[in-house]
Amino acid sequence: MSSSNDCRPPEARGSDDDLRGLEILLVEDSQSVADALKQHLELLGANVTGPAATTAEAAKLMTERLPQVALVDFHLGGEDSSGLIAQLRKEGVPVIVLSGSFESPAPVSLQGVTMLAKPVSEAQILQYLKPIVKTGR
């Protein structure tokens, strides 16, 4: 029997895609993309902080609650998020970078970081989040 506090659809409860308890920082300046990602991740049980539309807003949210993983748009309006990515990595937080375009070769700040090109599928994101759920980081 399912818990009355779990408002997710039955197919999302206890499945292989369960992200229950995962603390995610979402940094995305496109409100429609951020809303869709947040809604999907929360349906799978993740605790999503944000979305933050700027690096300053994301840094403030980080001080309130350090995430287990961060989904970060690389191009945020007129700024890039390389400084934020470096800060997250210094704290030991895995980062998944989302972007509509990547430079080739990747900037040094992105070396060793998971990078996904937008539009990104939910399956692609889950592929990288599920191992974090299992290990806790």
Residue ranges and their predicted role:
Residues 51-69:
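Acidic, metal-coordinating helix/loop segments flanking the phosphotransfer/catalytic sites
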Residues 1-23, 56, 114-117, 121-137:
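Non-catalytic signal-transmission and effector/linker regions of two-component phosphorelay proteins
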Residues 54, 80-83:
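Acidic catalytic/metal-coordinating carboxylates
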Residues 83, 90, 101-118, 123, ...:
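Alpha4 helix (beta4-alpha4-beta5 surface) of REC/receiver domains from two-component response regulators
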Residues 28:
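Conserved acidic carboxylate
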Residues 96-99:
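Hydrophobic/aromatic residues positioned on beta-strands within the core alpha/beta folds
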Residues 73:
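Active-site residues of response regulator receiver
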Residues 31-50:
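Two-component/phosphorelay signaling modules centered on CheY-like receiver
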